[in-house]
Structures are given as C-alpha cells and as structure tokens.
UniProtKB/Swiss-Prot annotation:
This is Potassium transporter 11. Residues 1-23 are annotated as: Disordered. It is found in: Cell membrane. Residues 1-51, 118-185, 240-248, 321-322, 387-421, 476-478, 528-792 are cytoplasmic. The lineage of its organism: Eukaryota, Viridiplantae, Streptophyta, Embryophyta, Tracheophyta. It comes from the Eukaryota. Belongs to the HAK/KUP transporter (TC 2.A.72.3) family. It comes from Arabidopsis thaliana (Mouse-ear cress). Residues 73-96, 207-218, 270-299, 344-365, 443-454, 500-506 are extracellular.
Length: 792
C-alpha cells in the first residue's frame, strides 16, 4: 500500500463535517488507532478542596508570613525616600502621600489581590501561567493544540460548561475564532511572566541594598561604596545557597517576618505617639484630593514612589501554592495590613518633625536603644523577601517550560516533603549576575526603585486583563460586575503606570530591557516548538499504510522493545516511517510514547499513563501517553520506564479478561493501578474476579521466556498470558529508546525575520538546552537518535 501523509489537525476533537471530508481512509485509521475515551472515562473526578481546623488554619496563616508577605513587608525600607527623592517642600505633602499609601494598600493588595485574585487560583496554584491554564481549560486558546477530550477526565481537570447564548459562550467563541487573539493572549501572559522574572532581579537588589544602607545612619563615616559591597556579598551568598533549597531553614522564615511586622508596628506606634498624632487624619481620602490640587509635576511623579508600597503582591500570588487562600487572607487582614499602616504612619509622623531625614526615614525613626537589633532584623527580613521572590521566579520558569514557552533547563526538586520547592541552576546564576549588575551599577535605592515600580505595575495590568477573562469564562460573573472590577482596577493601575512613564529614563528602562530579552527567548522558543509540532502533524503517516505492511512491517522483527518517542498522541510519527525506511529491522514490540504537558497543575500518578493497542495483536504495537501537569517534575528516581511497562502489562491483563466475556470491546485502554482494575472487576463475581486478578498480581509472577523468536507470532489469537510472557521476554532482551534528533530550518522562501528566528535564535537555544534523553533519564547505551530535517 502506498504511503500517505495526513493533513495536519491541530484540534483533539474532530467534528462530523471534517470527518466527512477525510473519507473512508480516515475512518479506517480511527478504527485501527482507537481513542482512549473508554479508559479515561473510568477515572473519577476526586478533587475536593481541603478543609482545615481553626487551629491548623491559624498555624498556616502564621507560616504564610515568611513565604508570601516578605516582599510586601519590607517596602517601608524605601517607600518615602523614593516618593520624595528631592526633599519635601510642603509638610502637608507627607499627609497626602500617607493617604495615598493607605488607600493603595486597601484597594490593590487587600481588595483586589487577597479577596479577588487569590480566589482565581488553579487548584491552589497562583501566577500568570496558572491563570492561563484556567483559561486553556475553559476555551481552546492554546496555540499548540495537543489536548484531547480524554484529558478532561483527569481528577485535576476541572471546567464548566456554557449556555450557548450566554455572554461567556460568546466571549469563548470570540477568543477561539482567530489565531491572532490566541497569540495575543499568550504574549500577554509571557509579558507578565517576564516582568516577574525581572522582579526576581530587582527585589533582592533594592531590599538588600536598603537594609544594608542602615549602616551609614549609625556609622556615618562609611562610604556608599562599602554599603554596596556589603549588599553584593549578601546577594552572592543568597544565590549561592539556593541549591540547598529552603526546606532546612524555611521554618525560620515565618518567625523572622512575624518579628519584623511586630517591630515595625511597635516603632510606628512609638513615633506616632512621640512626634505627631495628626498624621492619623491621612485616613481621610480628602487629603489625596488636596495633595494633587496643590499641583505640580513632582506630585504626579511621586506616585512612582507610592507604587513601591504595594510591591510584592505579584510574588504573593505566585507563591500562593504553598498555603490555602483562607490562610493567606487571615494573615494579611490580621497581621500584615494593620502593621504596615502603623509602620507608614509612624514614619510619616517622624518625617513631619524631621523632613530633612526623609532619605533615611526608616532607620532614623528607630529609637537608638534598639537600632542594631532592628538592623539585624531588617537585613534578615530583606533576605527572606528576596528568597520568596527568587522561589516565585523558579516556579514561573517551571510553568513556562511545561507550556512549551521556555527552553529546556535543568529543574531540581529540593524537598522530599513539598512538591513546589524547586531550584533552576541556570536561572539562578542569571538572576545573580543581573542582580549584582543592577546593585553595583545604580548604587542607590532611587533608580532601582523606579525600575522595580515599572515591573510591578505592568504585572498588575496583565493580571487585571487575565482576571477579566477569568471572571467571564471561569466564574461566569455578570458583565456588570466584570465591568466594575476591570474599570476600577485599570483606573488605579493606569494612573500609576502613567506616573512610571516619567521614570523610564531614571532607571525604569531596566525591567523593560530585561523583559524584552526574556520575551524574545520565550517567544522564539514557543514559535519554533509550535512550527515543529505543526510539521509533525502534517507529516504523520497513516496507520492504514503501516498495518498494510503486515505483522512484520515488511522488516525483520528482532528481539527487544522499541520505545518510539513522539509529540503526537495519535497517528504514526514521521520519525518511525523514516526509521523503517532506512533500516531493515524493527523490534518485536513497538510502543509509541507521547509525553504530554497539560494545562493542569499536576497529574496523579495513578492517572499518569494511558495505554492502548494499535492494530491486531500479532503486530505487538502499542501507544502510551504519559501526561504531566505544569508542577510535575521528571526526576531521576521516577522509574519512568518501569512504570510504563507496569501500565502496559496491566493493559494486556485487563484486555485478556475483557475478551473472556467482560466486554464486547476489541481494544481496551487502562490507566494505572491495581485498585482501579479491582474496581472494574467488582461488578461480576467478586471472588472469581479477584482470583483471576491475583493470578497476575505482579510482573515477577510472569515467567520470562528465555529465548525470543526473531519473528512476530503470526496468530492474532495469542492469549493474555502468552502475550505477557512474550512482551516480558522482549523486555529482557533489551529496551531501546528511539528519539528524533531533528534540525529545524526555515524554508528558502521564508521571510527574513523568520529565518533569523528559526535558523539562528531557535537553533542556538536548542543547542544549549537540555536534550529530551537527559530529561527522561534515558541511559545513553539504550538511546537511538534518528536524524531528520524539518523545514518550516
């Protein structure tokens, strides 16, 4: 039978009209390469939101201080100096600035993030990619359409249906209608992610430098160069110990930050009582109006400094996965919010009496008897705040990698207890170099603060736009509520953004340059990955042609198992046809392995593998889809190959039982665990079924064949036990991992920018990134690379 190349299909589901256009050959392919609906349908959606006792909730609220609120809590170190970098001209400006700080903390962190945005988590996961994953599950907005309807049966895959004429359904259709809208949404997510990465550079720089700046207050003879040197030493030490993880010292974070909040609140109350109680009138919003009424560009640009009072909220949302939302809400409303209000009010009271001390307002407002203890606490709190932001950056990079938007880098799991604690070596050293460059280059808080504020306000704008879609598609709120939330958020954030535009030439350009560099890398990588996937879809080979070659595939079937890795969940990849065209032999058992990342935070181990048979039994061909969420890691101790074979053996056993009368289906797919198999068999005679199951209770109970024939068994009626022995014998003979070593190039007629992106940038990124064989822990002696060139 002549070879045939199928046209690409980017969707997992194919409607009836498309099916009619494909004709009988497509129908034949579907019969030979059956879907996994039956298998996936067996999986019960067991996700339930955890409920916590009051005591445990208070404990988690306390622990959340060290992970979630360190960055937001250290803002008093530098806010007033960045608000009035040129000094204070009118004492009433202090009241106006304090009023702006109070209502900024109320509107953005408290009302928007803690009580609205944090509820838009993906099974407890936060960050821009978590919001994007939610949208991908409720609308077909992924640019790489490798999802299938069976993926929706995962216990962690939650979604809702829409009424056909609802506002949500209309918005969904509008998003899905054009590829340009999907692309724009992805770029929006990437911009937000890149800004958070920039935040991971700027937060340690400004926090540690501000904390170290306290040395000059009590030791005035020390030069600024010494302060910068001390800050750089602390930063190098901080990044150098990242590979140890925070598991061992993480228990210290919450007490340190808790002590910090109590200290700044106590000092704030002391300063209010001692210096000026009239600052409490700043709780009236009328002073905001008077502040701007006095006019002047300086008052408008001072919003850039006010903006720093709410920095850390982006890390708050990104680090949300460690704690339940209710714990985060309690910690903010009971401890963080009142302590910050007291701290800022106390500084304002001190500055009202000593306006010349605005540059070092925090340290100068500390009573002399507790100065050095506060310096130590401030430095420790700055380190904890930096650690939280660095950890959030690692998490976002991992999420971007899982979505195909970041080059393959090494990800290390640093804790056996907590899934979310990871370390990305390459990103860590890049962050350290850039952080030191920013600290040593600017040498002062003002310009770093301008850069920091620019990054944060852009992340807030991105979050607002994504939240608008979440409220429509996921929460299905009334359009009036959506409009109120969006308009109020954009009015506040665009006001801050307009003020930050005046700071671009004063350091605000730094996050833009950093974000542009990371955005270029992430977009080119995603574009190259997308084009490669489209090429594979277009060049996949018909199953009808493969099976038309007969059980031997027109080759010599040699003992062993061939695991053919592909990104396709259906059809035969081009790599396999290329392999059998150029080599005269193929393994007795062939398994097409598709490792797929889904827009869910995790895939339970018992649902990891989907297995099915391809064609008649005597072909000994199978397909295995390994599914991962964006938080799942490929670890060395995963035993990927072992678990794959366990799923394959379990499939063959269950298929044999079904053929014995339990099912009319010729092909059957299973996923996972013996308990699921027992549940499946529970409908019949329990004792008889369990006796049958116990016969195959373990792989070791199967007697391996000592010699494997070099030809495939001709009979399609091979029993389940015989086939298990055959596959196990082939496994003992040797397992070979067949992977594509593809080179992606732009076509000659491609545009200039596409040639630059594919032939140079993407090629360079692929050259320096990790190979799939390393990620999947494939032994080099069992690896077979098949070279190909893809022209896109």
């Amino acid at each position: 039978m002549a070879a045939r190349v199928e046209a690409a299909t980017m969707g997992g589901e194919i409607d009836e009209e498309e099916s009619d256009e494909r004709g009988s050959m497509w129908d034949l392919d579907q019969k030979l390469d059956q879907s996994m609906d039956e298998e996936a349908g067996r999986l019960r959606n067991m996700y339930r939101e955890k409920k916590f006792s009051a005591l445990l909730l208070l404990q988690l609220s306390f622990q959340s201080l060290g992970v979630v609120y360190g960055d937001l809590g250290t803002s008093p170190l530098y806010v007033f100096y960045n608000t009035f970098p040129h000094g204070i001209k009118d004492p009433e400006d202090i009241i106006g600035a304090l009023s702006l700080i109070i209502y900024s903390l109320t509107l953005i962190p408290l009302l928007k993030y803690v009580f609205v945005v944090c509820k838009a988590n993906d099974n407890g996961q936060g960050g821009t990619f978590a919001l994007y994953s939610l949208l991908c599950r409720h609308a077909k907005v992924k640019t790489i359409q490798n999802q299938h309807r069976t993926d929706e049966e995962l216990t962690t895959y939650s979604r809702t249906t829409f009424h056909e004429h609802s506002f949500a359904a209309k918005t969904k259709r509008w998003l899905e209608k054009r590829t340009s809208r999907k692309t724009a949404l992805l770029i929006l997510v990437l911009v937000g992610t890149c800004m958070v990465i920039g935040d991971g550079i700027l937060t340690p720089a400004i926090s540690v430098l501000s904390a170290a700046g306290g040395l000059r207050v009590n030791l005035p003879h020390i030069s600024n160069g010494v302060v910068v040197f001390v800050a750089v030493v602390i930063l190098v030490s901080l990044f150098s110990v990242q590979h140890y993880g925070t598991d061992r010292v993480g228990w210290l974070f919450a007490p340190i930050v808790f002590l910090w909040f109590l200290s700044i609140a106590s000092i704030g109350m002391y300063n209010i009582w001692k210096h000026d109680t009239s600052v409490l009138k700043a709780f009236s919003p009328v002073y905001i109006y008077r502040y701007f009424k006095r006019g002047g560009r300086d008052r408008w640009t001072s919003l850039g400094g006010i903006m720093l009072s709410i920095t850390g909220i982006e890390a708050l949302f990104a680090d949300l996965s460690h704690f339940p939302v209710s714990a985060v809400q309690i910690a903010f409303t009971v401890i963080v919010f009142p302590c910050l209000l007291l701290a800022y009010s106390g500084q304002a009271a001190y500055i009202r009496r000593y306006p010349d001390h605005v540059a070092d307002a925090f340290y100068r407002s500390i009573p002399g008897s507790v100065y050095w203890p506060m310096f130590i606490i401030a430095t420790a709190a700055a380190i904890v705040a930096s650690q939280a932001t660095i950890s959030a950056t690692f998490s976002l990079v991992k999420q971007a990698l899982a979505h195909g938007c970041f080059p393959r880098v090494k990800v290390v799991h640093t804790s056996r207890k907590f899934l979310g604690q990871i370390y990305v070596p390459d990103i860590n050293w890049i962050l350290m170099i850039l952080c030191i460059a920013v600290t040593a280059g600017f040498k002062n808080q003002s310009q770093i603060g301008n850069a920091y504020g620019t990054a944060v306000v852009i992340v807030m704008l991105v979050t607002t736009l994504l939240m608008t879609l979440i409220m429509i598609l996921v929460w299905r709120c009334h359009w009036v509520l959506v409009l109120i939330f969006t308009v109020l958020s954009l009015v506040v954030e665009c006001t801050y953004f307009s003020a930050m535009l005046f700071k671009i030439d004063q350091g605000g350009w730094v996050p833009l340059v950093i974000a542009a560099a990371f955005l270029l890398i992430m977009w080119v990588w995603h574009y190259g990955t997308l084009k490669r996937y489209e090429f594979e879809m277009h060049c996949r080979v018909s199953m009808a042609w493969i099976l038309g070659l007969g059980p031997s595939l027109g080759l010599v079937r040699v003992p062993g198992v061939g695991l053919v890795y592909t990104e396709l969940a259906s059809g035969v990849p081009h790599i396999f046809s290329h392999f059998i065209t150029n080599l005269p032999a193929i393994h007795s058992v062939v398994v097409f392995v598709c490792v797929k990342n889904l827009p869910v935070y995790t895939v339970p181990e018992e649902e990891r593998f989907l297995v099915k048979r391809i064609g008649p039994k005597n072909f000994h061909m199978f397909r295995c889809v390994a599914r991962y969420g964006y938080r799942d890691l490929h670890k060395k101790d995963d035993d990927f190959e072992k678990r794959l074979f366990e799923s394959l053996f379990l499939y063959v056993r269950l298929e044999s039982m079904m053929e014995g009368g339990c099912s009319d289906s010729d092909d059957y797919s299973i996923c996972g665990s013996q308990q699921q198999l027992k549940d499946t068999l529970g409908n019949g005679n329990e004792n008889e079924n369990l006796a049958t199951f116990d016969t195959f209770d373990s792989i070791e109970s199967i007697t391996p064949v000592k010699r494997v024939s070099n030809t495939v068994t001709a009979s399609s009626q091979m029993s389940g036990v015989d086939e298990l022995e055959f596959i196990n014998g082939c496994r003992d003979a040797g397992v070979v991992h067949i992977m594509g070593n593809t080179v992606v190039r732009a076509r000659r007629e491609a545009r200039f920018y596409k040639k630059i992106a594919i032939d140079y940038v993407y090629a360079f990124l692929r050259k320096i990134c990790r190979e799939h064989s390393v990620i999947y822990n494939v032994p080099q002696e069992s690896l077979l690379n098949v070279g190909q060139i893809f022209y896109v």
